Amino acid sequence: MMAAKRTANRRRRQVIDPRIRAEVIAKWGDRCWLRLPGCTGAGEEDDHIVPWSHRGVDSVANIRRACKHCNAMRQDRVLSGYGATIHCVIGPPTADLIGYAADYMRYDSVMVAHSEFARVLSCDDDELAGKKAVRLAAALAWDAAYRQLARTQTPLDVWLIRTLPRSRSHPDMLAEWIAFDYDIHVVDPGAEQVFDTVDNAADEQVARQWYAMGVTQASVCARLAQRHAQLVQLGLRNGTTAHDDSLEW
């Protein structure tokens, strides 16, 4: 019974009035709006900006075209501000990412940090927190928290704290964050200070991976500006300032 209901729901989401689809293509174009890593660019499917899970409707304002790859990869994540407003703080080991975020967080902000998950799991035992099993559990907790908060319709203020913006399942997480127009902060005290400060081989390896990525605040801002301009053209952002716009239906 439940399987049949899920199948019916999938069919319902895929059925769009051809007249609405024609209007969407005429107004917003027939190219993929998501631009996630691996995007083909083709407008192959109808995608709800506000998903069905958020009670999104079949309307020209709420539908854009998407390629099959991006539509599947999206997994009901929404643009920053269409549910939670998401900020990301990234940087090499020893950079004070949490301290940086704390200066900007609101009293009711939500923070997702691997180190905090590890601290809670180990009951503040630093040696235990460094164990592989605990670190893996913390990583899984981070991933689960991100998946939930990226899809929520609750207007939360969320701060994602992470060293490397990538994982096995999301090898180009940074590009995904840019596609969803997250507010991204790069905190990097510089390679010399980082390598002088790291005190173990694991952190040194992560630091080398970080600098091999070549991530800088300037490069991230340039990519975000380009993405924001695309979203303005698609009618999904207003004005010229990223992250704080809201769509009027």
Q: What is each model feature region?
A:
Residues 1-34, 53-57, 80-82:
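Short, charged surface segments at domain edges that flank catalytic/cofactor-binding sites
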Residues 34-65, 74, 78:
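Histidine-centered nuclease catalytic patch
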Residues 71-85:
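Extreme N-terminal, non-catalytic leader segments
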Residues 82-87, 154-156:
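Pre-Walker A (Motif I) flank of P-loop NTPase domains
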Residues 85-105:
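Glycine-rich phosphate-binding P-loop
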Residues 98-157:
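Conserved substrate/cofactor phosphate-moiety recognition/catalytic segment
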